[in-house]
């Protein structure tokens, strides 16, 4: 349920963009992200950090997009978020006892710390790659291509890395048995 709630805003944004424009889509993104925080609160008695961070970034960049009537703000949102994710993972890689990915998944997955560090580093590089790719697509392609890639391209890339990570983890779990 949480995963569906977390990806719903992206598809609402896409639908509103297709029927209206980037500015109405940005407004819809702000509204649906706020509603998701409320739904999280009602269902789970808490708002998880990712949903709150997502709402605050959508509110900030979406509001700037609408207020200045400039789509560059919403285009930069995803780049900045990816850079933040990359930096958080990278900082946890070198300056904390456990990498961030391990903190999220170690309750369910038991593998050596060295493998967690490799996975964490790969995901940090992935987010940096996505940030650069987003800038490239936003500036060298049409807005429609950017929206389509934002929704379907980044989702596909993320699912692909999740699949590769799962296979890698499964191999390491099998070796530990």
Curated annotation (Swiss-Prot):
Superkingdom of the organism of origin: Bacteria
Keyword Lipoprotein: no
Segments forming a coiled coil: none
Keywords, ordered alphabetically: Cell inner membrane, Cell membrane, Membrane, Transmembrane, Transmembrane helix
Record's signal peptide: none
Gene Ontology CC: plasma membrane
Keyword Nucleotidyltransferase: no
Topological relation to the membrane, as annotated: Multi-pass membrane protein
Residue stretches spanning the membrane: 22-42, 50-70, 76-96, 121-141, 149-169
Compartment(s): Cell inner membrane
Main location: membrane
Family note: Belongs to the YciB family.
HAMAP family for this protein: YciB
Its job: Plays a role in cell envelope biogenesis, maintenance of cell envelope integrity and membrane homeostasis.
Name of the protein: Inner membrane-spanning protein YciB
């Amino acid at each position: 349920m949480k995963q569906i709630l977390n990806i719903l805003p992206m598809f609402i944004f896409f639908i509103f963009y297709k029927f209206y424009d980037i500015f109405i889509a940005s407004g819809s993104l702000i509204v649906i992200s706020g509603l998701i925080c409320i739904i999280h609160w009602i269902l789970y008695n808490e708002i998880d950090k990712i949903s709150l961070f997502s709402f605050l970034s959508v509110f900030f960049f979406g509001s700037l997009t609408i207020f200045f009537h400039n789509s560059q703000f919403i285009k930069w949102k995803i780049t900045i978020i990816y850079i933040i994710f990359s930096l958080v993972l990278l900082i946890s890689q070198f300056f904390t006892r456990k990498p961030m990915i391990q903190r999220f998944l170690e309750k369910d997955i038991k593998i050596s710390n060295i493998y967690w560090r490799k996975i964490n580093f790969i995901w940090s590089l992935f987010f940096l790659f996505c940030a650069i790719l987003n800038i490239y697509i936003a500036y060298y392609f049409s807005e429609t291509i950017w929206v389509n890639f934002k929704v379907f391209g980044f989702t596909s890339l993320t699912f692909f890395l999740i699949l590769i990570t799962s296979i890698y983890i499964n191999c390491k779990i099998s070796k530990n048995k």
